[in-house]
Amino acid sequence: MQNYVDAKFRILQNQTKDDAFIFWNDDPIIAREIAKRHPEATLYPFAETHENGVKGYTENNQVVIETANGTFTMEQDLLALTGTHNLYNSLASGIASKIVDIHDEKIRASLSDFTGVEHRLEKVLRVRGVDYINDSKATNVNSCWYALQSMT
């Protein structure tokens, strides 16, 4: 497992103080590795709830992104994609967008009308009130769990 973690964290080797490292703050493995590696990049953690130092989070049904370029907010219910994993993806992409100073209106529009990608919780059709969804990318237990969780 550590070899896999080391491979994923190689990205930090070439990052400088001028770069951004956006990461999920709630994962204890990520937290441990960041503490161990002392990255030079500016850290942009995100989490489901507001904690000290977190740059992307939800609070009172609002998605909140805080960077040096300002604060972005939008109603969580307006996110186009459902599920916790898609919330995390929205927080990460929102942070990246604010870092490069994309206008709030464009971020809001993107997060509220993004249709997803093929084979990932792709809505195929509805027949007699039953939704048929193509999630053929969910090839492991974790992917299936997040997909099913997003439907409740």
Give residue ranges: language-model regions.
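Acidic, Mg2+-coordinating active-site environments of NTP-dependent enzymes
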Residues: 1-132
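AMP-binding/adenylate-forming catalytic core of the ANL superfamily
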Residues: 136-152
